[in-house]
Amino acid sequence: MMEIRLATIEDAHAIYEIEQQSFSVPWRLESVLAELEGAANKLYMVICEENHIVGYAGAWLVYDEGQITNIAIIPSARGKGYGSKLTKQLIDECLTRGMKEIFLEVRISNLAALAMYRNLG
C-alpha cells in the first residue's frame, strides 16, 4: 500500500541512501539531517510502499514562494508514477501552507524529470 507523509528525522538514513542512488553529487548525511531538523521554512515528504521509503521530495518555503529542492525515487521504483504522486502532494502541501508560487530547477539533460514536470503542468 502506498503512503505519502511528512518526513521525520528518523527518515534521514533512508533519504541519504536514496540520495546516494540518485545523484552524482549527493547530499552528505549531515546535510540531510540539517534539512530535516524541523525548521518552519523547510518541507520534506516521503513516499512509502509497504512501509519502505521509496522516494522523497523537499521544498524551502520563503515568504509566499516555494522552491522545490530535490525529488528522488529509488531506481527500482522509477517509472511507476511515484515521482508524480509525490510531487503533486508536495505542491498541494506548499499551497496549503500559503505559497503563491512554486519554483524548481532541473537540468536540461534530465529528460525523465522534464517529462514529469510537463505532465504535471
Predicted features by range, described:
Residues M2-I4:
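Extreme N-terminal starter segment of soluble prokaryotic enzymes
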Residues L6-S76, T87-E93, R97:
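Acetyl-CoA-dependent GNAT
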Residues A14, A115-M116:
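Well-formed, non-transmembrane alpha-helical positions, independent of function
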Residues I74-K80, I108-N110:
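Active-site acidic-Proline motif in GNAT/NAT acetyltransferases
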Residues T87, N110-A113:
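Short glycine/proline-centered loop/turn elements that form peptide/ligand docking sites
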Residues C94-E105, M116:
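Conserved GNAT acetyl-CoA-binding A-motif
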Residues R118-G121:
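Conserved acetyl-CoA-binding loop of GNAT-fold acetyltransferases
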